């Protein structure tokens, strides 16, 4: 009798768990993407080489190619939703798009609101310095002085790093990277704090002979895809997608995209 009761109990529990799994899948963003046949990705152009516009106004970059590969793996169309970075999380939480692929750093503060996939690349914050200051500013510590103005992008980790490491300097924020770095090029600010890949690429172009790249990273920053909470199926798929493109040495997509956007800078001719 006891065995029958235990068996019945286990059956009820397993049935309940199975039903919960089915309900989770029905609510999953991944299921909805497959059903509608479209993946909607939010990003903000202007963050080289992750996302930017070419001379014809088309959005290109490392993140765009990752998004294309993701949509192809899902068997759906890709739609890019151009979104200002300071409101990009709010848009995700109000279901304006399915996922954020926009060079977003994993932070504990953001993680309280959204879930992150495993990192797809790791960067750090570095400094672009106006050349007129190169004799007086030899290390990042020298920049922590009230006589210096430092720029960063509003709401990004460059702003967080600037305020953390340069408490005595004046930190001024801007909506875009181009606005913030222009202040340094013009001499109105001494330095710009931003992600290392962007700063490296900028030095190969407009920053050459005008700026100094202090390329020792101030921070360790893993970048990841951002999705809404409560969606284990989507998160599982994303992590497996990342694992596949990183470990598949036949297709070698991860390495090819890294070479295309971070090593080879031919694409600069398309945006300048």
Model region roles, listed by residue range:
Residues 122-129, 196, 200-243, 261-272:
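Periplasmic-binding protein-like
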Residues 87, 104-112, 161-164, 182-186, ...:
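A ligand-binding cleft/hinge motif common to bilobed small-molecule-binding domains
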Residues 20-24, 65-73, 131-133, 141-147, ...:
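Extended ligand-binding regions for polar small-molecule ligands
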Residues 42-47, 81-86, 95, 99-107, ...:
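Beta->alpha turn/N-cap motifs
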């Amino acid at each position: 009798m006891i065995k029958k009761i235990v068996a019945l109990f286990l059956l009820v529990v397993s049935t309940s768990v199975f039903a919960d799994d089915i309900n989770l899948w029905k609510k999953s963003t991944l299921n909805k993407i497959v059903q509608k046949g479209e993946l909607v990705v939010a990003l903000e152009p202007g963050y080289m080489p992750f996302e930017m516009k070419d001379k014809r106004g088309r959005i290109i970059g490392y993140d765009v190619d990752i998004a294309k590969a993701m949509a192809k793996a899902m068997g759906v169309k890709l739609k890019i939703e151009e979104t200002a970075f300071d409101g990009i999380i709010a848009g995700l939480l109000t279901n304006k798009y399915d996922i954020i692929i926009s060079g977003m750093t994993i932070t504990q503060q953001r993680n309280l609101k959204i879930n992150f996939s495993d990192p797809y690349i790791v960067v750090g914050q570095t400094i672009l310095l106006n050349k007129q200051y190169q004799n007086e500013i030899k290390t990042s510590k020298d920049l922590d002085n009230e006589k210096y103005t430092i720029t960063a992008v509003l709401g990004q980790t460059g702003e967080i790093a600037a305020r953390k490491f340069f408490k005595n300097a004046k930190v001024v924020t801007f909506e875009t990277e181009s606005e913030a770095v222009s202040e340094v090029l013009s001499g109105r600010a001494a330095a710009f704090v931003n992600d290392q890949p962007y700063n490296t690429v900028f030095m190969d172009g407009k920053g050459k002979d005008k700026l100094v790249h202090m390329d020792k990273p101030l921070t360790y920053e893993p970048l990841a895809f951002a999705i809404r909470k409560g969606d284990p199926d989507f998160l599982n798929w994303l992590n497996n997608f990342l694992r596949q493109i990183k470990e598949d040495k036949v297709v070698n997509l991860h390495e090819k995209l890294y070479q295309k956007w971070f090593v080879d800078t031919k694409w600069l001719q398309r945006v300048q």
